[in-house]
Regions:
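Core segments of cupin and vicinal oxygen chelate
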Residues: 1-27
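A short beta-turn/loop motif at secondary-structure boundaries
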Residues: 6-10, 37, 75-79
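Conserved acetyl-CoA binding element of GNAT-fold acetyltransferases
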Residues: 16, 43-44
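Short, conserved beta-strand edge motifs with alternating hydrophobic and charged residues
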Residues: 19, 35, 46-48
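Intrinsic, low-complexity N-terminal interaction/targeting segments
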Residues: 22-34, 74
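Vicinal oxygen chelate
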Residues: 40, 46-94, 98-104, 117-130
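An amphipathic, aromatic/His-enriched active-site/gating alpha helix that lines ligand/cofactor pockets
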Residues: 106-108
């Protein structure tokens, strides 16, 4: 899926979620997200957990241990993952997620706006990892 934004009346691609094409086999909504930016960088690493209970028990265990919470808990619009973002001791952003969309090649690709990238079905709006 491409993320489109308006730049002085012209639509430009801000980024793209990419997934492994396995034909009719269902795969995660995205494996990588590329963004058109002025400099090279890596935004965050994401780790899938088994279910809602694992996500929330990890959330409270990390809080209790004094780790720095960054963003969440919420549900992304694109990919529909339930998410929770944290900072590691070096300030790097880590995401725990569960229950994301599974798609096959028949789904194709969509163009979506920045509001879908930054928005949530529920939970905080904004940019994770800040």
């Amino acid at each position: 899926d491409e993320i489109i934004m308006d730049n002085e009346g012209k639509q430009e691609t801000l980024g793209a979620f990419t997934r492994c094409n396995r034909g009719e086999k269902y795969v995660d909504h995205h494996t990588l997200f590329f963004i058109n930016a002025d400099q090279a960088g890596f935004n965050h690493a994401a780790f899938e957990v088994t279910n809602w209970d694992a996500l929330m028990s990890s959330h409270y265990a990390l809080l209790k241990a004094g780790h720095r919470h960054s963003f969440g808990v919420g549900k992304h619009i694109l990919g529909s993952q339930t998410f929770d973002y944290w900072k590691d001791p070096d300030g790097f952003t880590l995401e725990h997620f569960t229950d994301g969309d599974l798609l096959n090649e028949s789904f194709g690709s969509q163009k979506r706006g920045l509001e879908d990238l930054l928005g949530t079905h529920w939970g905080p709006d904004g940019m994770p990892g800040q």
